[in-house]
Amino acid sequence: QILKTLTRQNAFVTCLNDGQTYRFHHMMKECAFRAFRTLDDSRQAFYYERYGAWYEKHGAYIHALSAYRRNQNFAAILRVVQKDAGILLASLKPEEVLEVLNRCPVSVLKEYPLAILVLMRCMFNWKNIPKMLELKELLLASIREHPKLSEEERGNLLGECDLIQSFLMYNDISRMSQFHRSASEKMTRPAISIRSDGGWTFGSPSVLMMFHRKSGDLDKELEEMNQCMPHYYKITNGHGQGAETIMSAEAHFMRGNFVDAHIALEKAYTQIQGNGQESIALCCDFLAQRLSICMDIKMRNTFEERRKELLQGHNTTWVNIFDSTCAYYYAVTGQTERIPTLFGAHMLSTVNFLAPGRPMMEMIENQVYLAQGEYSKVIGRSESILAMSQALHYDLVALHVQIQLLAANWKLGKTEQALDLLRRSLSQAFPDGILMPFVENYPYIEELLKGSFFGINENFLFRITRMGKEWEMRCDQLKKEEAYPPVFKVLSDRELEITELMAKHMSNKEIAQSLFLSEGTVKQYINQIYSKLQIPGDVRVKRKYLLEMMEGKS
């Protein structure tokens, strides 16, 4: 009743559409918080405890952690960490988590072995391996010393420890699987420290970029994924399900086998339907976007619809991954004005990306710089991105960056450097038949590809060139389709050109002078435009209606 009265009388409080949730303006929240701080410490502590419990109950774990931190309620903090399983925790700054961890008494930590497992994985995500290993020793001590643990649960915890340790072998599929099989032998239940609805890709929009480790080994890596993932699914209740399928689809795409890529993509979409594997779904979306440039496929959602859907999930990681896929799509198709702000305005430094996913984000930002004509920036950044990629054995990411680097060198007139990088990139890609990074950058490297490259298969070069030309034509067609309302597809290029000039309120005479045509010819074109678009009425009404249709395109 108090909230209803406040809502009626105060513009700073609004009731949301669900009729149950209220939003307070930040100014009112600040005033309320200042008033709250005038309460004595015990009263504040009482309410912080209530805040924490309410947020915890409703799954708002970041807010719950914030409330419990103010009370130094470490047991509650660890309970929330265990429930969150590192999903929302990953969005916090590592130093914030470490600061709480360092203040938490060891005796309390030992009471929450599952929270320790979650924190171990977080430390891997943040590249803090010494702390990860320190927590492992604490976990083993906790398992040894815990008086109430059954032998079965000790086995489960030791199995989960093997599971978390597998990340130390990250992207070496067979070595990771050895830990998964060891964990499977010890465990009688699915892992608790990894929730099946949590992210699997560390923020990467591509599984293939994560696991293609070495030039010439792609087929071997695909087979290893097929053999190893079932063991991982068994102990994680299907976490990351569909990863091997989308990786196979991506490999087909990289080799220019678009029909096979599309079939595998649809299999992956079917495999993950309704099982909460959003990170795998985003990898599917990324491939679907890239595939839609190369062949006629029906997208499941428009970019705007998909982003709105993700925003409703209140997980910024998913939104950032999707923005990265859109940024790449718009960069390679030359639609720089449509690149999401995070990438278009180069704001990656404001986001806490997990270490294994950062090279992919940096590579995509490099592609954006290339599309924006910032060639010196591309050259200046590429060395550090290549170093990151090589440290993580990201062979495909490194290939993308090398091609971006050679394109930038070529654009700045550094021909020898560009040719050397092209030779290296072709030699790296040929053993696995990887074509698409060259094709997607064909407008930059078309002239360079006309040279002769000793030791490089001629058919491989021919396929890149042929597919590059087709890809460039499809990009031009896509840009035209996306720049106008769907009904404008019936217009020819010349008619679209005249339509654009009409939108600038140019007269028939001005249009004729601009295009070196006679006024009579322009008038004929305009009548054809009206006829094709089925616009009725007199001349003035027709033109007004056409302009309204043009404005509706945005």
Which ranges hold each PLM region?
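Recognition helix of helix-turn-helix DNA-binding domains
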Residues: 505-544
